[in-house]
């Protein structure tokens, strides 16, 4: 995104297409993490290969691990055989020692560290790793890819992806290993967590299954003229028969492109950063890019059923413009007080007041020269960035607080180089990071 000034802000990501469920990130960023520290800066030399022991997935346990990383399948190198189509899950302790296991490739899949343990999945299995070992759960319906994971206070884990009929699918995994699967066909839109449930925002053009119920609900609510298209908040899990439950409805707004529902509800209120297109008609005719517009907040109050659109303005009171290269796709977001704080995939950090829409550009994280951008995670206090030095296959974890103080290097290590890059006469490929997660309560000495 970029304020209405001469100085552009870099965010080379895309918001999902209006017809897509959630924006896909295409080629993920390269990098992986290895050791951790007890001081603000730790430089560890390249660990021997024995520092990481390879095990079967069902033999993993958390032990002293503080960091978990999921590596993608190998990326192709011209003139060499096809790279391996699998993923690595790596667990590392504060000294760079750890465990690694190979599982089947599942594009877009995340590792998620919860109070229950570490959650990750393959196309046909789900895993939960704890201090006692790994629970391996068979998945009845095979997954081709994954979009997001969510954790509930009662220990349940929800996995979101695409359904068999180009719709939305959610698997809810109970602590005893039971899996409840919900599929909503022909439905798209941003999806997120709201209390004990998974909800989404869609409309009657993007979801045929809600069409009749949505128009009926709007007619009962308004009593006025019927719009051509009705927007709705729906509950994805626990549907009402074959139709998702409607939580709120409102007239659809032409050219309103939802972003990423990356922050849970605040009570009964859902706030979603979105884009209002400059010229929806020109977008439909192919003359304008669908991401050209301004940033707004779409705010739904489920207790009243009302929707409000709040313009997002920079510190000079000007709209924040979006385009193909500067938008909301893939941002990492967290709520801190009355603000959404987020970092783009190029390291630009912002704060937006969820009530007024006033925005602040906090900082831009300087990045070393790498083949691909860093991978980010956010906490209430700041941003963690994971970067790889392409020449040396060295990995760096850094931290920058939201309130300033500059970028702090937390660790640098080469212990994972053999998992990142394979170079020999018969095979050459590079892996990228699908995701990484820090153990709850561990900050690497950042505070």
Language-model segments: residues:
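Surface-exposed loop/turn elements that mediate protein-protein interactions on large endomembrane-trafficking
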Residues: 48, 78-106, 122-144, 163-186, ...
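Repeated scaffold domains used in trafficking and secretory/extracellular systems
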Residues: 53-58, 104-116, 142-154, 184-197, ...
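Bacterial N-terminal signal peptides that target proteins for export
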Residues: 4-33
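N-terminal "mature head" segments of proteins
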Residues: 2-3, 31-166, 170, 428-447
């Amino acid at each position: 995104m970029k304020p209405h000034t001469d100085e552009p802000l870099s965010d080379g990501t895309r918001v999902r297409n209006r017809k897509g469920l959630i924006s896909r990130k295409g080629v993920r960023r390269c990098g992986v993490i290895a050791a951790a520290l007890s001081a603000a800066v730790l430089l560890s030399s390249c660990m021997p290969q024995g520092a990481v022991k390879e095990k079967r997935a069902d033999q993993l346990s958390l032990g002293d691990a503080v960091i978990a990383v999921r590596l993608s399948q190998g990326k192709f190198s011209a003139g060499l055989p096809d790279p391996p189509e699998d993923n690595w899950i790596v667990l590392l302790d504060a000294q760079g020692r750890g465990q690694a296991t190979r599982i089947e490739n599942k594009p877009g899949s995340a590792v998620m560290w919860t109070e229950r343990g570490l959650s990750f999945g393959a196309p046909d299995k789900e895993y939960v790793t704890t201090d006692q070992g790994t629970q391996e759960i068979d998945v009845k319906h095979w997954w081709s890819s994954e979009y997001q994971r969510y954790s509930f206070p009662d220990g349940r884990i929800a996995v979101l992806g695409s359904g068999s009929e180009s719709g939305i699918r959610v698997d809810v995994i109970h602590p005893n290993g039971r899996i409840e699967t919900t599929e909503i066909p022909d439905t798209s839109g941003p999806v997120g967590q709201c209390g004990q449930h998974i909800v989404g925002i869609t409309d009657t053009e993007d979801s045929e299954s809600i069409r009749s119920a949505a128009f009926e609900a709007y007619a009962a609510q308004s009593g006025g003229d019927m719009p051509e298209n009705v927007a709705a908040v729906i509950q994805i899990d626990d549907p009402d028969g074959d139709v998702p439950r409607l939580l709120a409805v409102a007239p659809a707004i032409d050219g309103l492109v939802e972003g990423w529902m990356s922050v849970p509800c605040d009570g009964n209120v859902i706030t979603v950063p979105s884009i209002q297109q400059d010229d929806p008609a020109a977008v439909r005719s192919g003359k304008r890019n669908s991401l050209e517009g301004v940033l707004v907040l779409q705010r739904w109050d489920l207790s009243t059923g009302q929707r409000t659109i709040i313009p997002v303005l920079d510190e000079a009171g000007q709209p924040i413009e979006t385009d193909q290269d500067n938008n909301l796709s893939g941002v990492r977001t967290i709520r801190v007080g009355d603000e959404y704080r987020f970092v783009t995939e190029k390291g630009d950090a912002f704060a937006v007041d969820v009530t007024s829409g006033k925005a602040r550009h906090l900082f831009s994280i300087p990045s070393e020269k790498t083949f691909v951008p860093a991978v980010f995670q956010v906490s209430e206090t700041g941003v963690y960035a994971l970067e790889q030095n392409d020449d040396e296959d060295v990995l760096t974890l850094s931290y920058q607080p939201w309130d300033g103080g500059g970028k702090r290097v937390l660790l640098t290590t080469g212990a994972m180089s053999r998992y990142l890059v394979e170079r020999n006469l018969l095979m050459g490929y590079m892996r990228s990071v699908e995701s990484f997660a820090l153990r709850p309560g561990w900050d690497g000495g950042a505070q």
